[in-house]
A protein has these predicted regions:
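Serine-dependent amide/ester hydrolase catalytic core
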Residues: 23, 48-132, 184-186
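A generic secondary-structure micro-motif detector
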Residues: 2-6, 67, 115-116, 158
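Charged, often glycine-rich, active-site loop that binds/positions anionic groups
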Residues: 38-52
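Structured core elements
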Residues: 28, 87-89, 139
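Short glycine-/acidic-enriched loop or helix-start segments at secondary-structure transitions
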Residues: 4-5, 38, 97-100, 149
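Short, acidic Gly/Pro/Ser/Thr-rich loop/turn segments
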Residues: 1-4, 95-96, 162
Length: 187
């Protein structure tokens, strides 16, 4: 639904390879049973309901169904984290890009090597995994594209284990170098 660009994928592949060389067991793919389109729909509905709460017109039953789906997603993640310490996900579909506010957000696009992509694929898609379930997510820098643009990775951890994702980010930084300030900010 929101595949990352080739240059971002290359940075992730280098990161995963380095983790494997360090002795980590890496399982590729999302948890079995995770209905990504339904998760995105539920997250979008709950976010819209929250934003429009002052105009509560939507039937309460729809909110209850969405909340029930959120609890099912949370249970799926709990099961996943019984056999995995963390899950690594993209933060966005591209590396850094110029900000353009000349169009309404729904009409904005981002130029990528693969062509124009909807702006709204950039952030909301990947954050739904942690946000809908209410599990911790930490973002860490993992490298630069060929053009020198920064790429981050999202580290998800079990519910109430915020320290796990933060500690993994610190260990990852030790292994792959962590944040590198742009030349104009390096001292």
């Amino acid at each position: 639904m929101a595949p990352v660009t080739a240059d971002v994928a290359a940075v992730y592949e280098r990161t995963v390879s380095e983790l494997e060389r360090a002795g980590s067991t890496v399982t590729r793919g999302l948890p079995a049973g995770l209905d990504v389109p339904a998760q995105l729909e539920t997250f979008s509905f709950l976010l819209t309901a929250m934003v429009n709460a002052q105009n509560v017109v939507d039937p309460h039953i729809r909110w209850l169904q969405a909340s029930q789906h959120r609890l099912a997603v949370r249970a799926l993640w709990q099961s996943y984290f019984e056999s995995h310490d963390v899950l690594l996900l993209p933060t966005t579909i591209t590396a850094a890009f110029p900000h353009d506010h000349s169009e309404p957000i729904g009409k904005r696009t981002i130029d990528t090597p693969e062509g124009k992509r909807p702006y709204l694929q950039q952030v909301p898609y990947w954050i739904t995994f942690a946000s809908l379930a209410g599990i911790p997510a930490t973002v860490a820098p993992v490298g630069l594209t060929r053009d020198g643009l920064p790429v981050g990775i999202q580290i998800l951890a079990p519910m109430w284990e915020d320290a796990t994702s933060i500690e993994f980010a610190a260990l990852l930084a030790e292994r792959i170098g962590g944040f590198t300030p742009p030349p104009q900010f390096a001292s």
